[in-house]
UniProtKB/Swiss-Prot annotation:
One of its GO terms (biological process) is formation of translation preinitiation complex. This is Uncharacterized protein HI_1225. The keyword Protein biosynthesis applies. It comes from the Bacteria. It comes from Haemophilus influenzae (strain ATCC 51907 / DSM 11121 / KW20 / Rd). The keyword Protein biosynthesis applies.
Length: 106
């Protein structure tokens, strides 16, 4: 019954629900860059996983990478997606920031 919503309480004042914090699994310290085309009608996307950053830091990093690559992208569930096959450039940019990077997948 942990998913139940409070219906009645004798407490005085407004009762606020606690916000559930997003918990991501800890990685092994290696950032992986994959090429994905499945479900994208053949368009290639570079997917960056393994970054142990907060949501705001991920958004800032994604914005900088998109600007440096000159393309679009998105942040979804702790994963950065950059449009196009820019794996080599992304690897170079992330290594300059001090991340340990591996190219994985196709």
């Amino acid at each position: 019954m942990s998913d139940s919503v409070l219906v009645y309480s004798t407490d005085v004042g407004r009762i606020k629900e606690e916000k559930a914090s997003v918990v991501r699994p800890k990685g092994d310290g290696v950032v992986r860059i994959q090429k994905q085309t499945s479900g994208r009608k053949g368009a290639g996307v570079s997917v960056i996983t393994g970054l142990d950053l907060s949501d705001e830091e991920l958004k800032k990093l994604a914005a900088e990478l998109k600007k440096r690559c000159g393309c679009g992208g998105a942040v979804k569930n702790g994963i950065i997606e950059i449009q196009g096959e820019k794996r080599d450039l992304l690897k170079q940019l992330l290594e300059q920031k001090g991340f340990k990077v591996k190219l994985s997948g196709g």
